[in-house]
Amino acid sequence: HSSSIDDNRKIVRFLKTGLHKVGRFLLPYLVDTYIGCSTKASEWMFPRKCIDSDSYYLLHNAIDLDLYDRNINLGLEVRQKFNIPKDALVVGHIGRFTPVKNHSFIIDIFKEVLKQNPNSYLFLLGDGVERHKVESLVKLAAISDKVIFMGYVNNTVEVMQAIDIMILPSLFEGLPLIAIESQALGIPILVSDTITQEVVLTDLCTTLPIDNPEQWAHEIMSKFGKNKYIDYRSRIKELGYDSCVAIKKIENIYKGKQ
């Protein structure tokens, strides 16, 4: 199992990168089955000969689609809790406060959104080492009344009901669940073009470069208020992102039936 090398300390990154290269070289001699959540993540983790072998399986990150019912009333309740008007634009991001999540760019995007629509709010769900840094950026921009730091949230699906559009301008990701969850709920999501195209399951997901916050803000405004809810869960299930399907597939891998 692996996860991204997400650390802004140069020495730690250097050491972890070195260990990754060594581990990647040794994998064919130590492991007999390879499972990746996306093609991009697999290419980072496994040597090419492992991916091309019969022992490699692509098993997408999956969710329990039954939990993702769109509930407008629940969304309004969440907005009322934070004194957010019914007609306001709510932009959301879910993720740890670490360098790879690119929170400074998120703040730049939201500042541009506010120029076009002052009746806008930003939900930031998650916690981490860079939270205080991001809070300082928000305070410096004098938009503290527009940005809500929620910390770790157990009921993310409930909070997402109040969000109009999700953004994920990460520097890199494997296959982010939030992109799947957003589309399952019928919420448009913008993701960076550094993320695997495998997250684009429906027309709700748009990829953008992470060098122009104005472009992101323009895309957000172009989608706000124009999204007619469509239940894409059947399509998402067909594409293999339902947890029931994924569980059965991994059971078969363990039993040697695949």
Language model feature labels by segment:
Residues H1-Q258:
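Membrane-interface segments of envelope glycosyltransferases acting on lipid-linked substrates or membrane lipids
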